[in-house]
């Protein structure tokens, strides 16, 4: 499979700032996103690997962070979607990037959906 082959249309990307839960160092992860009302939604797919990505594991101890979309830097609070929220939201990123469904089929873990709420 060719990565990126699942794009059905141009997909917006953002930069997510996250602080290491171990070292305290700051990092930036480029991620695909969709919007849901005033919220920004990202998916911790890690391309279907067995473990969640580092950026995702860094968010629970440090949920207040920033994202950058274009030149717009925004403060957000990262919240993992509940099972009901995930069920409602999951089809939307899959519609934007079909490979998310493939990634889910490659792993036994439920791929988390993260809601980035303005703060």
From Swiss-Prot:
Keyword Zinc-finger: no
Keywords: Cell membrane, Membrane, Oxidoreductase
Cellular localisation: Cell membrane
GO cellular component, one term: plasma membrane
Binding site residues for coenzyme F420-(gamma-Glu)n: 21-23, 27-32, 43-46, 54-58
PANTHER family assigned: DEAZAFLAVIN-DEPENDENT NITROREDUCTASE, F420H(2)-DEPENDENT QUINONE REDUCTASE RV1261C
Protein name as catalogued: Putative F420H(2)-dependent quinone reductase Rv3178
Organism: Mycobacterium tuberculosis (strain ATCC 25618 / H37Rv)
Biological classification of the source: Bacteria, Bacillati, Actinomycetota, Actinomycetes, Mycobacteriales
